[in-house]
Amino acid sequence: MSWIPRGEPKLMSAACSPDTWQERMKDPRLAGSLQLQGALVQKYFQECRSELETGDNGYFTNLKTMMTMKYAPQTHPFLRRVVVNLPGNVKLKGLLGLKGDLKRRPLVIVRLGIFSNVEDFKPERAWLMMLFEQSPFNVLLLENMSSSDFVANNNQFSFGGYDEGIQNILVARLLSDPVEPLSQLVDSVHVFGISLGGHGVLFSSLLNKYNSPKNGALINSFTALCPVVDLRKTMVALTEGGVKSAFVDLWSRQRLTGLDKKLPALVTYDSFAFLSKAISEIARTYHGGLSYISSVRLPPEMKDSSDFWALNDFWKYYKQVEQPVLIYATEQDPAVPFNLNSELIQNKDLKIDSKNLRVIELPQGVHCTLPVPYDWHAITSLFQSYILSHSPGFKMVERTLDVDLSDEEWAGFFDAGSRVKFEVQEPSKKSGFVTIEMEVENAKGKEKSMNLSLPLSQFDFRFLNPELSASEQEMIVRWLNQNLKLRIQPKNGKYALRATWSVAQ
């Protein structure tokens, strides 16, 4: 049942080409206004709906497809396990993705969803492929505090945006600290969170205002996919009766093995009431932020306390956030109901005094299964261009290869409507090149085929092992499908095939 995402671009009209909208997103005139950027994204989904949507809109199709992607991040040569040590003796496990060079790049902190840890995360694999493999960013993927690994490795336990938001600030400080060797590879820091991990992204966007140095933002941008906005009501919706709640309860028991050793009251619980009792016990025994220290500045009038629910309802303090916060939310969402969460921001039911917060509402998808009902290439382009637009110090350089097509075989073939379709062939384990199979079509519908070989040494990764692993082979295909541009180039009455791709400068 598993499948390997390739991220293949499909031919779209010029008006709906992801490349066109990506360049618009990176326009410096828009980067200063999140409302304009958000309006542009919403407009893209509305005006290009027929080309962006794949037709895979079924509820179970979306869930099954997101859960069955074939990917082995734990054995990926470019990903390594790390442990981040935080105040309060908190240990946070992560996967660090580095391109293998010494270039300063934007680094994206990815916060996983409920119960997810770096040894076992499924739907979030798509975002790791998009942000690390297909984009010019380095990535630090961090477990959710509700994961079994976090329970096993820490004496205290909690969950939610208050604690994870503080963690995000502390991790961003580490990544920006000149004493830390990793900081030498960091151009700017960005945070990207999913579901319950999105709640911490939202709180850290508020904390960022009070914890950034005078010379610039600590964190440059925030992205939240189907985030929890109202933690208490979302938890009630997950645990209050029905088949869904019974399934979630069984799932939580399986994923939180060992929690009863940290919360003795969980030794006994009523049928299908494990999660609700766990949540109640966490709130009852909460003593304040697990990693809260006085150097983390909270908003005025907000104090660290033992009131779990009050601390996680931080919206009354949410004023004039300075860095952009872009939320993607799907109307269909059984896990984080849209009407209880992102819709509160969109409809202004939450009185938020900030122009740097914007919701993109999407009609297709189930709990942000965006790469299933929408074009993978386009989604990646939107994520990539948003982060790039808020990384002003990061520059890219375009690599170009021209192939002369003036010989007899191509005589009279080309016209103003000529275009190129391509398919990337997976390179062999010992190859230093990758083959691109192309079909060139002119305006009359005639087609010709040709192949092109490109050297791996010219891409945005440094391949140091004598043989490519399966993960690297698949990554190369995805990277080229996202970044390779091919076109027929007229020059002095002749024609050439021009291949271009961009890499970090």
Predicted regions and their residues:
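N-terminal cap/lid segment of alpha/beta-hydrolase-fold proteins
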Residues: 52-100
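Short, surface-exposed "cap/lid" segments of acyl-processing enzymes
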Residues: 99-136, 140-145
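Short beta-to-alpha linker loops that shape the active-site pocket of alpha/beta-hydrolase fold enzymes
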Residues: 143-148, 228, 365
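Glycine-rich "HGGG/HGxG" loop immediately N-terminal to the catalytic nucleophile
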Residues: 146-158
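Alpha/beta-hydrolase active-site loop
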Residues: 158-181
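Alpha/beta-hydrolase fold nucleophile elbow
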Residues: 183-195
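Alpha/beta-hydrolase-fold enzymes
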Residues: 194, 200-293
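Serine-hydrolase catalytic core
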Residues: 247-366, 374-383
